[in-house]
Amino acid sequence: MAVYIATVPPVGWEKVWDEAARRADYSGPRPPVITDMSVLIQHGADIGALVTRTVTRELLAAAPHLKLVQVPFAGVDSFDLATLREAGVPLANSHGNHEVTAEHAIALMFALTRRIIPYDRDLRQGIWHGFTTMDEPVIGLYGKTVGIAGLGHIGGHILRICRAMDMKVLGLKRTAGGAYSDLVDRAYGPEEKMEFLRASDFVVDVLPLTSETENFFGKAEFEAMRGHWFINIGRGGTVDEKALYEALKDGTLAGAGIDPWWVYPQQPVAKDPVTGRMLHPVFPAHEPFWELPNVVMSPHTGGFADVSVDGLWGESFENAIRADRGETPKNLVDLQRGY
């Protein structure tokens, strides 16, 4: 059996593979990259582990020796988990970018509270703000309370960064215990969600998208956060889009930083070769968030940085190599819960 790659890997993936192979004490050939599912099915009998962004029922049926489906990022909402359960094939994700994703959440907080984007935009036109007097509210993070919804790898790293800034840290978890529960000032359960929201100056959404977390944040939740700030670094589907837009528009929320969205380009982004601008712009939501002054937006880039490619793909490759030779994989996803 062998490892196969069924998605387009990043530039320079060969070097990342070689390093992962060295860590796993593997000296065999690099894996084939086959993105055409019909072609990949023809190799089904040889596939021991598959690095991919999705998988079909037909491929699972054609790969009787498949020991692991490995996704090179954290989110698994693009997979049909019921089909994997039926096939008895485990799914693993990668947490190799949790540090940079946490950094992005903090960057959104700073951009909002320090008004970095409007100040930069105005100063480019010679317009000064606050040089002699503070004529607008600029919010410091020191001493504030941050509530982290989802205390996994990313949430845990956000916790550590906020601790370094002397912030009070609250956590919202589905289950008691866990690696980071003892590090927060207080951990809340799902039944205490509203109390958690009211106590948090900043709420950071790091939730995976599951049937239980879909529209987890809606009108009532934003009302409980009145005057506070909302950061989403998890999944767009965990938030009621219209409710968030209305809460920002009418001032219920002080502001929001948004990285994951509800609308994405369905085709590769085509750019003008001269200007570099997108030929066919795709707005990221059904509601016009881009018209609101109290929103900072990023195009779902929170998990990407120079170091995250090695982290995500290196961890994925090593896990696939070890699974292919019969070792127990790391970072297995609970196919019932969805994370």
Regions found by a protein language model. Give the residues of each.
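N-terminal glycine-/charge-rich "phosphate-binding" loop or analogous flexible N-terminal tail
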Residues: M1-A49
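Alpha-helix C-terminal capping/helix-to-coil transition sites in glycosyltransferase folds
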Residues: A45-D46, H65, R198-A199, A224-R226, ...
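Phosphate/diphosphate ligand-binding glycine-rich loop within oxidoreductases
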Residues: D46-R124, D135-V138
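Short glycine-/small-residue-rich Rossmann-like dinucleotide-binding loops
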Residues: V55, A74, K173, D201, ...
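Oxidoreductase and adenylate-handling cofactor-binding alpha/beta cores
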Residues: A102-R121, R163-M167, G314-E327
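Rossmann-like dinucleotide/phosphate-binding beta-alpha-beta segment
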Residues: M134-G227
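Rossmann-like dinucleotide-binding domain for NAD(H)/NADP(H)
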Residues: G234-Y339
